[in-house]
Regions:
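Short coil-to-beta strand junction motifs in C2/discoidin
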Residues: 13-30
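A short beta-strand element within beta-rich, extracytoplasmic domains
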Residues: 1-7, 14-18
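Hydrophobic core segments within long, regular secondary-structure runs in both alpha-
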Residues: 27-32, 65-67, 88, 129
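Extracellular carbohydrate recognition
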Residues: 81-83, 98-102, 112-136
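Internal, hydrophobic beta-strand segments that form the core of beta-sheet-rich folds
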Residues: 2-5, 25-36, 99-116
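Extracellular carbohydrate recognition and processing domains
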Residues: 37-100, 122
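Outer-membrane beta-barrel proteins
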Residues: 10-12, 117
Length: 136
């Protein structure tokens, strides 16, 4: 469930390569992934261009190992009605025959600004999330 109390217009852009710029509609994002990584992924962002960022919609693997499956939801509108919104994120599998190595991990990311790692977006976005379930 999620409720996007406010999704606004980007009012910051540090020009670190984000696909949005000041004046564009920002997007929140909820993303999940199943990965088979041999170590933790290091991601850095802030005052310089981000390092280690990855998007499972654009790549099937990173240095740490393969991305087995992912689900993603971009939210580009503020919610209305004051009630949480139920949503299911279907998993898109890159590898349907992968055998567990014992290293499978679940990644869950919820961001008020999908491109916040790039220091671009709306500073006043508000996103609430609750009640994650893995249904299989």
């Amino acid at each position: 469930q999620y409720y996007a109390e406010h999704i606004g217009i980007a009012d910051i852009d540090k020009n670190f390569g984000a696909p949005i710029h000041e004046g564009d509609r920002d997007k929140a994002r909820i993303m999940v992934a199943i990965v088979d990584w041999n170590t933790r992924r290091e991601v850095g962002s802030g005052t310089e261009a981000p390092t280690g960022t990855w998007d499972p919609e654009e790549t099937t693997s990173v240095d740490e190992g393969p991305i087995i499956a992912y689900g993603s939801l971009f939210i580009d509108q503020s919610s209305t009605g004051g009630k949480m919104i139920d949503v299911q994120l279907p998993l898109n599998f890159y590898d349907t025959k992968a055998k567990p190595s014992g290293l499978y991990q679940i990644v869950i990311s919820c961001s008020t600004s999908a491109y916040g790692d790039f220091m671009a977006g709306c500073k006043s976005n508000i996103l609430y999330v609750d009640n994650f379930e893995w249904v299989y």
